Amino acid sequence: MPIIEESTMTYAEACRYFPGGVNSPIRACIPVGILPPIVSSAHRDIFIDSFGKTFIDFCGSWGSLIHGHGHPKILDVICNSASQGTSYGLTSENEISLAATLFSCLEFEDHKVRFVSSGTEATMTAVRLACATTGRSIMIKFLGCYHGHADVLLKGISIDESNIHQVPHIVDTYFSGNPYLPLNLILPYNDIQIFKEVMLQVGERVACVIFEPIAINMGVVLPKPGFIEGVITISRRFAALTIMDEVVTGFRMGIRGVRSIMDVDSDITVYGKILGGGMPVAAFLAHHRIMDHLLPLGQVFQAGTLSGNPIAMAVGKASLELCREVDFYPKLENLAQSFFAPIEEVICHQGFPVSLVRAGSMFSFFFRETPPTNLREVQECDHQMFGVFYRHVFAQGVYLSPAPMEASFLSSVHSKENLAYTQNVLIDSLMKTFGSL
């Protein structure tokens, strides 16, 4: 039986048990029109599907695996920790050890942290904490930035630039009066003037402003110079708390997260992915004056049976220790530069209407002449052409994140051989997509 038929049957079996055959929707690969691979095993920079085909992996569990699949140190930690128990439901030594390592990396003083199991839990609770701390009931987020699938983070009002002066009316109409159910205002990403105008009108009622320091969940969209800094400065002018969502960017470009490359300082910061090293770990942290509003010291509720799971905590510490190794980030940046340079050269030389945008080892291909700066420009990209490109890449055993509005990732263990092969595949696929081959 041909492989494609076997693969179809396997996916059909998955669909018997899971809605859409998956436990997270993007895994269905619908935006790129491929049958989703079903993984059998993974090692370093590759995974093998259930029919033995090998793929070079540039998704890396959506950026979690900066150290690749099955790093020996992480595997050792998992085995050693599991031998001491899999879950306690009590505070463990491993939690304390990871917290100490985390604060040492970030160079924070007078802060406290709460560990949870997912980025959604972390951002959801951070918003709840901000509302209770300030006693206010408006949250501002930016269009195209994803902060998890809690209701408070999915719902919202999209404010058009031409309707900016209608904001007070909208707020009064939809204001719930419940500090735990804030009104969600959504503003355009990268437009500091609109943000300033909105804050001038409703700033004294804003509990928090949540943002990605580098937008990742509409593809890699870089902030304009001064945008993030301006958001933080203006927010503080109105005593609104800032929540910096570093679930993806945290520890990706430096051991202090984006603070390694940007002069930013939020009130609450959220981490995940790399922090867990492939295990379900996320965290939110802030100055103790804010964090002590959480139960059992304060009145803000958060709980989780598996929060601070001892195995996950041990792996998290191992992940951070690997990131702290000498020249870890310079080596990763050099790897990225040498990998992307030939591809960028071909795009420029051929005049392809493609923008390869990267932030360190995170990257996206946008099928448009210039890099997008907001969601509207991302939506204007030629997603159909991206799908054609993606299918050429996938057919040759390279797995990018399967959507035009998602980021892909390099790891520290991508081999020179696999990177050289992938360079050729990406260039070949671009040429085929635009009919140059």
Curated annotation (Swiss-Prot):
It is an enzyme of class 5 (isomerase). Keywords: Cytoplasm, Isomerase, Porphyrin biosynthesis, Pyridoxal phosphate. CDD domains: OAT_like (cd00610). It catalyses: (S)-4-amino-5-oxopentanoate = 5-aminolevulinate. Its EC number is 5.4.3.8. Homodimer. Belongs to the class-III pyridoxal-phosphate-dependent aminotransferase family. HemL subfamily. HAMAP family: HemL_aminotrans_3. This is Glutamate-1-semialdehyde 2,1-aminomutase. It comes from Chlamydia abortus (strain DSM 27085 / S26/3).
